[in-house]
Each structure stands twice: as structure tokens, then as C-alpha cells.
Amino acid sequence: SEDGQAVVEENGYISQGNTGAFKSTEAEGKIVVAGSSSVTPVMEKLKEAYLAINPNATIEVQQSDSTTGMTSAMEGMCDIGMASRELKGSELAAGLTPTVIAMDGIAVVVNHNNTVDNLTSEQVKEIFTGKLTDWSAAQ
């Protein structure tokens, strides 16, 4: 919702644009949200905003990691899974539907003594997958 995206932006994430105004249905009951530790801070803020207009609802946010969140959603242990990555093919095949609520920036930093000063996204990927194992190959 527009309100949710405002919360996303206020907390330093990149919003996904205006998705319209949220209209409270005065929901009741409990929702369990589980997963990514990097999504948890913004989810806690979204929880606060939601509960401010739906005081009879209960939201439990369980912090772990993306895979645990997706597994918990697939197994019915939580209502909403949080992931800070794209869903895997197996997760999509299991029926999970992704909804992007925000994007976060990731920075790669090298020691100031390192002569490498301009890495491409592909080179970073190759470093972390082990394809590039020597800095000289990244220059």
C-alpha cells in the first residue's frame, strides 16, 4: 500500500512505488511472519504501522534467514515468509508467490591497499562462487 511504501522509504529501503491506499478492515487474529534478518527491521516497522490501525490483530515476527522463512511458509509454520533474495525454483514450484516490498543496496568494499578499484557485478559473482580466486584476474 501507499502507507506501507512510506514506511519502507522512511527506514532507508527503496520502495516499490505507489500501490494505492490501504483500507483497514479492522482485522483480528494472529499472523506469523518469519525469515530474513535483513527484512526484519522494516517488517517490524510495517507491523507497528499495521497494528496502529488494526489494534485487534497480532503479528509475530520471527527472525532467521531467507531459506528458513521460505521453508516455514511452505510447511505452514508461518503465514508470511521473508526473503532478501529471489525465490528458488523449488520454492516457486511449491506454490510460494513472491511480493517485492522493498529493495536494499549491497556494497562490496575492498581494503584500501588492494589495487582493484572497479569490479563489475559479474566479477563479484565470480569471486563469491569461486570462479575468480586471484585479485589479478579481476583487474
Describe the residue ranges of each PLM region:
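Flexible loop/hinge segments at secondary-structure junctions
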Residues: 1-139
